[in-house]
Amino acid sequence: MYKRQAVELPMTVGVDVKCDRHTRYTILLVGAFDSNKGQMELLQAVKRIVAEGKDILCYLVGPDVGFMPKCQKYIQDNGLDNNVKIVSYTQQVVSYYALADVVLVCSTFETFGRVAVEAQKCGLPLILSDVGANPERIEDGVNGLLYQKGNIAELAEKIEILRDENVRKMLSKNIDSIAIEEKYGIDNFASSFCTLLGL
């Protein structure tokens, strides 16, 4: 009779880039183009912001699984070509973290949330939908912001709050990058894997 033993293997992220800033307020959403990832919700928020006469640049980075054409049509129909850039495939996702002031996770549901951890390792403030494991990733108003999933007005408002560089710096300062590295770094993964193998 074998006795089963379970060992949790932590997800790992290997992002060591400290991100450079620039003059145009830039936001980033990384994820496959899927209706559950929230690209359309973010586009609607960007439309509201642009309609108020404010400049913003939004990068949507991720592979297409059938939803990208709908996003492209929305961008074109609403005159957002100068405000939204789609990157359908890249092996250099880290370079887009380096361009961003803020990273968003607008998913309908989220479990581990690798993008959120990568952003935190870059020292970037987050705006997350209030679903799944997202509320566990941050303390709202301390090291990131939460918004009610589906509330476009609130999402646009949170994006505008982080236009203020001082607010972004405050949130970034409160990110515990050491704890993130200890929990999700390769050393922790290797240790857990060795435990699993009985080494």
Predicted regions and their residues:
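A conserved mid-protein helix/loop that constitutes part of the nucleotide-sugar donor-binding site
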Residues: 25, 29-48, 66
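Glycosyltransferase donor-sugar binding loop
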Residues: 30, 57-70
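Nucleotide-activated donor-binding/catalytic signature segment of Leloir-type glycosyltransferases, i.e.
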Residues: 71-88
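Aromatic "clamp/platform" in nucleotide-sugar-dependent glycosyltransferases that forms part
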Residues: 89, 108
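Short acidic/histidine- and often glycine-rich active-site loop of Leloir-type glycosyltransferases
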Residues: 117, 130-141, 145-146
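Short hydrophobic beta-strand element within catalytic cores of glycosyltransferases
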Residues: 125-128
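Conserved acidic donor-binding segment of nucleotide-sugar-dependent glycosyltransferases
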Residues: 140-141, 145-152, 160-166
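A charged, aromatic-enriched C-terminal amphipathic alpha-helix characteristic of glycosyltransferases
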Residues: 167-198
